[in-house]
Amino acid sequence: MANMRVHELAKELNITSKDITDMLSNSEKTYKPVSGLTDAEISSVRKKFAPAPKVENKPAAQPAKQSQPVKNDNRDNRQQNQAPKQPQQGTQNKSGNADDKKHISQVYFPQNSSRDKNSRRDNNNRDGQRDNNGGYRNNDRNNGGYRNNDRGNNGYRNNDRNNNGGYGNRDNNGGYRNNDRNNNGGYGNRDNNGGYRNNDRNNGGYRNNDRNNNGGYGNRDNNGGYRNNDRNNNGGYGNRDNNGGYRNNDRNNNGGFRNDRNGQSGNGGFRKDNDQNRGGFNGGQRRNNDRRDSAPKEEFDFSAKPDSRRHDSRIDSKKNDRKRDNEAKENLKFANSRFDKKPMTKPEKKEKEEETIKQLVLPDTLTIKELADKMKVAPAALVKKLFLQGKVVTINEEIDYDAAEEIALEFNCICEHEEKVDVIAELLKEDEEPEDKLVPRPPVVCVMGHVDHGKTSLLDAIRETHVTAKESGGITQKIGAYQVNVNGNLITFLDTPGHEAFTAMRMRGAQATDIAILVVAADDGVMPQTIEAINHAKAAGVEIIVAVNKIDKPNANIEKVKQELTEYGLIAEDWGGSTTFVPVSAHTKQGIDELLDMILLTAEVNELKANPDRKARGIVIEAELDKGRGPVASILVQKGTLHVGDAVSAGSCYGKIRAMIDDKGNRVKVAGPSTPVEILGLNDVPNAGEIIMAADSEKEARSIAETFISEGRKKLLDDTKHKVSLDALFEQIQAGNMKELNIIIKADVQGSVEAVKSSLVRLSNEEVVVKVIHGGVGNVNESDVVLASASNAIIIAFNVKPDNQARIVAEREKVDLRLYSVIYNAIEDVEAALKGMLEPIYEEKIIGHARIMQIFKASGVGNIAGCIVEEGRITRDSVVRITRGSEKVYEGPIASLKHFKDEVKEIKAGTECGMVFEKFNDIQPEDMIEAHIMVEVPR
């Protein structure tokens, strides 16, 4: 038991810490409640304060002197001590108040009475307390007014445990007094004696005890008659939690002459108010008095007698109790009525909300005002809603569909995405042709290839062989397309050696040709434009027939051409592929007939058919403004039959056909499928690649043209906004507008092209497919830009530059053209664009030069460079490069930049300044300083 503290031993012995410290104070050692005790000290204390045997504590029985028996609630002691004890002769009321004595003589303590001799369990004494009632009653733990206490107990009271004699307490007997273990005297308390006196910690008239219990004129840690409390309580008839002075308390209850909880020093006035138990000569009345509360507050009159106080307290307490009970009932009734009303409103609200659900059809983008109009709410309500979400908007601000849907859902509106209708596509839309009306039509063939590989020579050879009809003078009319008759079968050739018209047609969705003839020189093999032509044809989805030209030359190597073309997916039939290879010679006319036969065979295999008995529909091949004839358009009729006098529309142009001229220069009145003709009668020059359609009337044709004009303007704006670039690629992927990323690669060597192509293709993911539509060697030319514009592609160039014309076209067509010197940078940029993390490009910009003139040393700073700015400016946030001769000695930030003693942000040319460099002091006079900043380069 060594090291037991004073307060622990005091608690065990049911005494105060001060009792122990006072006992041990004779020794030299100073003791506090937290001081440790040795075994010898503990033993001496136990011997001093050990309780006496119970048999010695039983007082002699005395006749009861109360007017009414009261039940004892302490079941352990209910059979002991049938009669109360007489008060000790030597103990007197120190106040000298005889009336107090008389009144005290009427008290009967239930501990000294048998349960069988008492009235019923819930006591009938009106001055009683709940389960422990009597006239000036007994309580379990914390009791007031002439009362019994539990542990450290005082005069006129009985104790709870192991108790009991008349007016006496556990182990200690005395007239009008209780002595727990070492406690003395009437109106006195443990270890301290005397009327009007205080013990242990807290003081008050008719004094206080140590902890939680109250006695007549005394309390433990709580308040007595005219006294103060232990810790947070004030004297003068008032205390927090437990009070004495002619009163009883249950736990948080107040007695007469006392103030409310946390009462003020000096306030009394027969007042009791705390919790639900009563004091002031009215010890609780919880059972017999309908939970009535105690007497009202009044100013205490020192001249008033205890009897008069008791009398007033009872009368006033009854009145006050009724009043408080009535107020409590009213408050409870009001509170219940409030709670009852709330649930009734909720179901009605929900039903209302279900009734007001609306369905909205929303476009891709709309303004706040338009959304509010569709929802039938005030625009200010939407602005407020967004403001509360931390978004500051105006009613004219545009939001996308997702944001609009989120707002609408909060207003109980269900949204559907508006299906965008392409008006032009609807106008150009065609119904399926019935099979029984379809007839075979001539194939449309385009000749493509590298420069000087013999495209023009091959066309001339075909024309010389099969074109018989010529105009007078022997000059063939060149209208951009012509027909060749091969054994009674017609073949239409498009005389478009360049790729501009071809890509323009594909850009507008027109399938102008059925078969592409790829001309490759047998002595040169595959060249850059050959690869470009292959990519164009594949992008258009047309059949490719390879014409290996110049086989008459000595160094011709057909097998080499076949081998080179296999790298681009064109594998000869005799090599196990599906591509037709025809060796020809435009010079000797060798292989021309075989080439034409293969064209007819391919057309037959593809089953090229059209319906001639319908309104005509075709494509504009070329168009020009003739001085004598006006707008002239060379067209290719693809479906139906076109007649002179038909009303037609071609994009934004319309008119009535006045004349038609065929490829031989003859005027014709009708033109069937796959027939090229020149038409006159349009109001303007149409663009190459526009769709030409016959209409029922000129008015209808004009209406179609006007629709094309208005929709064309909108499409131009949309195309400008949605042109593909790496910067905006991720947003377009997220919006679902991008499923395929087309890339054109140009490099200085073929190996770089192949390496990048394979690397970029591997970047494809679930949301977007990377597709390299063209890869070639050489500078970026206009044809590359036109292909990129038509295919909505990005051009990536390595160690090559675009020519002037290509740069102009790229700027005009808004084509994203990127130049790289390192392959991996391009791969990283495309990968970052796919992930939406494209970082801006920064480049170094030199802003100024300075010379170090003198060195200054400063403690704690290091070397300071005294400089003069010779050119430009030096800024505080710039990065400097210090050179000594041709050697760079430092590159890093400036730690400090001063002009005289002032820290500055910038020093201009001709100004002296002082500079300190971060973690660098090895500077010398005549060192040169170059300052630069990093600026973002527009991408």
Curated annotation (Swiss-Prot):
Residue ranges occupied by any tr-type G domain in the UniProt entry: 440-609
Cited Gene3D superfamilies: 1.10.10.2480, P-loop containing nucleotide triphosphate hydrolases, Translation factors, Translation initiation factor IF- 2, domain 3
Biased composition annotated in UniProt, kind: Low complexity: 79-93, 131-257
GO MF annotation, one: translation initiation factor activity
Renumbered residue ranges of the record's region G4: 549-552
Extent of Basic and acidic residues compositional bias: 114-130, 287-355
Region (G1): 449-456
GO CC terms in record: cytosol
CDD domains: IF2_eIF5B, IF2_mtIF2_II, mtIF2_IVc
Function: One of the essential components for the initiation of protein synthesis. Protects formylmethionyl-tRNA from spontaneous hydrolysis and promotes its binding to the 30S ribosomal subunits. Also involved in the hydrolysis of GTP during the formation of the 70S ribosomal complex.
Official protein name in the record: Translation initiation factor IF-2
UniProt organism field: Lachnospira eligens (strain ATCC 27750 / DSM 3376 / VPI C15-48 / C15-B4) (Eubacterium eligens)
Gene: infB
